[in-house]
Curated annotation (Swiss-Prot):
Encoding gene (name): argG
InterPro entries membership: Arginosuc_syn_C (IPR048268), Arginosuc_syn_N (IPR048267), Arginosuc_synth (IPR001518), Arginosuc_synth_CS (IPR018223), Arginosuc_synth_type_1_subfam (IPR023434), AS_cat/multimer_dom_body (IPR024074), Rossmann-like_a/b/a_fold (IPR014729)
Biological process annotations from GO: argininosuccinate metabolic process; L-arginine biosynthetic process; urea cycle
Example GO molecular function: argininosuccinate synthase activity
Protein name per the record: Argininosuccinate synthase
Enzyme Commission identifier(s): 6.3.4.5
Chemical reaction(s) catalysed: L-citrulline + L-aspartate + ATP = 2-(N(omega)-L-arginino)succinate + AMP + diphosphate + H(+)
Family according to the record: Belongs to the argininosuccinate synthase family. Type 1 subfamily.
Record GO cellular component, one term: cytoplasm
Length: 401
């Protein structure tokens, strides 16, 4: 009886070739494909896995779990790796690993295989997550082991009659889920080359976007968007709706050269229309609902949290602690944010909250002003006292310093 290996199967080039490669190595392949909101035809993927030679294929709709348990933290934590990348692919990897482990345990498989290369981040994310969830399972990385070039891999696929939607002229590597779309390889590997329009799918070119803006109101409850223009949405449906609406206006294109875990720089093209709108609105609401010290400290946690996810450490004690902190800040992040969508921009035009810390009577310069300006004298004296003492001791600062 052959040993079974669960393969994270997408139906793309790498994993389709991996099925045949693992079979050649003497294993029975149990394919597993997750839907995390990419809109893929899973019936086609299911049949393709079996046609490739997999003995089983498990299709799992994890879109709602992805939005509620993972994307929700990206929103509450304003998560952006290197202040640019909203963790599109990285955010889905721990969930995918979790489901792969469940299937491996259910089918008595000896290990889990993935289609990641030896120079990417995902190999680390998957294998570290698998070790955290079930350290007895072995990890297999066919693409890393065969070390073929993209062209050699395509040749192998053609030789074994493996259908792939990729060619020598357009060898993009695409990953998509509810939170956005990531694209790399091909001409995109030249960081100076402008991305051609065929590298994009979720967003309209600026030249073709509507000449009239759309203005929407996002309503948040405990840091999570729950309504658009007064209409209730589940989080996954809300993101999909905003992907379509904001994408129509060309919002959410990101051209980023990022620092990978393995030490190289990689040029990535991301499309995150819904994410950009939600994150901008969420940050705007936090400006009136968080105290000054929390607002100033939270970005420190956000940066660490983003790096934990990017570096494949979702299942770790530190990440658990960071999640608790983020949750504790969101109790009063509730209210409405008005945001205009126009020509590639998501523009915040207003925000309100029943828990606002913004007091118009204290902020105004009209006759309604309730701020006691006489208090400023004593405040300045106390606040400036260390500076004054230092200046008296050392003779003050000269204009040349």
């Amino acid at each position: 009886m052959k040993d079974k290996i669960v393969l994270a199967y997408s139906g793309g080039l790498d994993t389709s070739v991996a099925v045949q490669w693992l079979i050649d190595k003497g294993y029975d392949v149990v394919a597993c494909c997750l839907d995390v909101g990419e809109g893929k035809d899973l019936d086609v993927v299911y049949q393709k896995a079996l046609d490739m030679g997999a003995v089983e294929c498990h299709i799992i709709d994890a879109t709602k779990e992805f939005s509620d348990d993972y994307v929700s933290y990206a929103i509450k934590g304003n998560l952006m790796y290197e202040n640019a990348y909203p963790l599109v692919s990285a955010l889905s990897r721990p969930l995918i690993a979790k489901k792969l482990v469940e299937i491996a345990e259910k089918t008595n498989s000896i290990g889990i295989a993935h289609g990641c290369t030896g120079k990417g981040n995902d190999q680390v994310r998957f294998e570290v997550a698998i070790k955290a969830l079930n350290p007895k399972l072995k990890a297999f990385a066919p693409v890393r082991e065969w070390a073929w070039s993209r062209e050699e891999e395509i040749d192998y696929a053609i030789k074994h009659n493996i259908p792939v939607s990729i060619n020598y002229d357009s060898p993009y590597s695409i990953d998509q889920n509810l939170w956005g779309r990531a694209n790399e390889c091909g001409i995109l590997e030249d960081p100076y080359a402008a991305p051609p329009e065929d590298a994009f799918d979720l967003t309209t070119p600026l030249e073709e976007t509507p000449d009239n803006a759309d203005e929407i109101i996002l309503t948040f409850k405990q840091g999570i968007p729950v309504q658009v223009d007064g209409k209730d949405y589940q989080l996954d449906d809300l993101i999909l709706y905003l992907n379509q609406l904001a994408g129509k206006h060309g919002i959410g294109r990101i051209d980023h050269v990022e620092n990978r875990m393995v030490g190289i720089k990689s040029r990535e093209i991301y499309e995150t229309p819904g994410a950009e709108v939600i994150l901008k609105a969420h940050k705007a609401l936090e400006t009136i609902t968080l105290t000054k010290d929390v607002a100033h400290f939270k970005p420190v946690i956000e940066k660490q949290f983003s790096e934990q996810i990017y570096n494949g450490l979702w299942f770790s004690p530190l990440t658990d602690s960071l999640k608790l902190f983020i949750d504790s800040t969101q109790q009063y992040v509730e209210g409405d944010v008005r945001i205009k969508l126009f020509k590639g921009n998501a523009i915040v035009n207003g925000r309100q909250s029943p828990y606002t810390l913004y007091d118009e009577k204290l902020a105004t310069y009209t006759k309604e002003d309730a701020f006691n300006q006489e208090s400023a004298v004593g405040f300045i004296d106390i606040y400036g006292l260390p500076t004054q003492v230092n200046a008296l001791l050392h003779g003050g600062y000269s204009n040349e310093q």
